Amino acid sequence: MVSSPTLRRIAVALERNPYEVVIGAGGLSRLGDELLKAGIQPGRRILVVSNPDVAAPYGEGCLQSLRQQGFHADLLVIDAGEERKTPATVAAIHDSAFEQRLERSSLMLALGGGVVGDMTGFAAATWLRGIQVIQVPTTLLAMVDAAIGGKTGVNHPGGKNLIGAFHQPSLVLIDPETLNTLPEREFRAGMAEVIKYGILGDPALFQCLEEGPEPNSAAGLGNSRLETILERSAAAKARVVAADEREGGLRAVLNYGHTFGHVVETLCGYGTWLHGEAVAIGMVAVGQLAVNRGSWTADEAGRQTQLIQRCGLPTAWPDLDPDAVLRTLQGDKKVKDGRLRFVLPMAIGRVEIRDDISRDEILHCLDQLRG
């Protein structure tokens, strides 16, 4: 087995089925080795699910690494835009699983961004009542957020991710070199989730992003700084997931910026904004809500907005009908007993969850955002 001393390892310390997030340049070539280290025995069948832009440069290398270690691997290529994140696409994955005769000992492996990871994870959760899944994210957003934690699912016309399941991966492998072929817009979208971790509990990470070269491309960050950002973000996500696997309480903080962000995605139409772009807009919106309540200072809200802009992300609220916004908010999956729950910033590095925000507060905030 090939030694891999350069790979960084982060434990997701779940009570049941703990796993590792493995980070390092060249990691994709050692994928088969890492499956063996994770206790996955050779001879098992693996359905690799990817999208065309990722499968072209990385699909064959992924299959080769798996086959060299004795796995029977096949590749399914699907369209993976946000508008394709539907039950119909999951059914296509199930069809391939049937054709490839995947058994309960078989695995699915997601090679791609957050949409591929979400759909592959959900397909694995529902095939034969659940088979193992491996996450190999190739976008920044998926690396720091979507691939870690076991949240899987697809969209419904009424809202984002309303159909889904918790299904933890057996391994997450992050190879930063795959970001070299990622379009810059998608890289910038992933930076929204990195900023989120700074707000949630890592002010040093937030300050790191404020300083030095503008963090709006992998090349601009440089290998060392990029791997540090990946490691700190993944570690932050792993800590929260380990403490609250199924979003019973603490894990809800990971939805910072997402409540308004999902409204933007839903009402503007899936695919109009990338997920991270919508989250960036949502963070600005919820920041304004917190300032209005007096729980956050205008100065720190301004720092957040400036950093979002520094990363090349949008901050302006789109022209949306306020009543449609309220209706969409009420359909959010985080609503509890009919009450909206928002993650509000209190300081850079500290947030709170509130369910006492009134309709009038939201409408006033929307008026301010529209300028």
UniProtKB/Swiss-Prot annotation:
Positions of Zn(2+) binding: 193, 258, 275
Subcellular location: Cytoplasm
GO biological process: amino acid biosynthetic process; aromatic amino acid family biosynthetic process; chorismate biosynthetic process
GO terms, molecular function: 3-dehydroquinate synthase activity; metal ion binding; nucleotide binding
Record text on cofactor binding: Binds 1 divalent metal cation per subunit. Can use either Co(2+) or Zn(2+).
Required cofactor names: NAD(+); Co(2+); Zn(2+)
Catalysed reactions, as listed in the record: 7-phospho-2-dehydro-3-deoxy-D-arabino-heptonate = 3-dehydroquinate + phosphate
Transmembrane segment boundaries: none
Keyword terms of this UniProt record: Amino-acid biosynthesis, Aromatic amino acid biosynthesis, Cobalt, Cytoplasm, Lyase, Metal-binding, NAD, Nucleotide-binding, Zinc
Pathway: Metabolic intermediate biosynthesis; chorismate biosynthesis; chorismate from D-erythrose 4-phosphate and phosphoenolpyruvate: step 2/7
Cellular-component GO terms for this entry: cytoplasm
Annotated EC: 4.2.3.4
Binding residues annotated for NAD(+), in chain numbering: 114-118, 138-139, 151, 160, 178-181
Domain of life: Bacteria
Top-level enzyme category: lyase
Pfam family, one: DHQS_C
Family: Belongs to the sugar phosphate cyclases superfamily. Dehydroquinate synthase family.
Biological function: Catalyzes the conversion of 3-deoxy-D-arabino-heptulosonate 7-phosphate (DAHP) to dehydroquinate (DHQ).
This protein's name: 3-dehydroquinate synthase
Source lineage: Bacteria, Bacillati, Cyanobacteriota, Cyanophyceae, Synechococcales
